[in-house]
Amino acid sequence: LVDDKTLVILISQSGETADTIAAMREAKRLGARTFAIVNAVGSCIAREADDVLYTWAGPEIAVATTKAYSTQLTAIYLMSIYMAQELDMLTPELLAKYIKALEKLPDNISKLLENKGEIQYIASKYFNSKSVFFLGRTLDYAVALEGSLKLKEISYIHSEAYAAGELKHGTIALIEEGTVVVALCTVKNLFDKMLSNIKEVKARGAVVIAVAEEGHTEIEKEADYVIYLPKCDELVMPSEVVVPLQLFSYYVSSLKGLD
């Protein structure tokens, strides 16, 4: 599958990740062009890749990457928009829409941070949980994986992320009374399906923390807690969704005395 017409994109905060370096070298051996999105300037991947885009997030002091993850997402958005432009796949209207969505992100995330006390309160209720499960569909599932990873990395709580569409195929058997479920509900055309998933886990005794775009107040009837996100284009919504998940993990870890 990999030849001289293949572009391999490598994403690494440190630029020293052993398996990513091995994949890069194998791709280059097969003739592929390699493009790295890296935070650490002058790192191995940055030096050896054919092209590199630095995210300039600054050093990550903690084990878990947070700001670098957010800048990596932004780099991917920009690259995708640029490539779509080059392939003449974006109308001027769509291009303007996506650029505006990116420009709004800093303000939207600032608004989220103003409400971090709410996330801290939720964390204070469930920082001693044995397991926390994350559910999402399509883009939300990708963010669920990141949220679950962060919680595991810094709080040492057992956590897994599952595609909500597969809930009935084994996953739901893990839900019992008091299990904490974080349900990501920001994909507009799948919102009703996520509501259905929330009802299913609630019926088995789960405590549900939902993350949804502001305006979807009907979710309050089903979830125990709702974290609302400022409205934004669905394309860049993962950049907003990940912030409360990072904060939740941080507060849980801090309350457990692991900071």
Task: Describe these PLM feature segments.
Residues D51-V180, K256-D259:
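Active-site phosphate/pyrophosphate-binding segments
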Residues T179-V187, V241-Q246:
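Hydrophobic membrane-spanning alpha-helices of multi-pass integral membrane proteins
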Residues D224, L235-D259:
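C-terminal functional extensions of proteins
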Residues L1-K104, L184-P230, F248, K256:
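Glycine-rich phosphate-binding loops that contact phosphosugars or nucleotide phosphates
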Residues L1, A18-I21, Y121-I122, A142-E146, ...:
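Extended hydrophobic-aromatic, low-complexity segments
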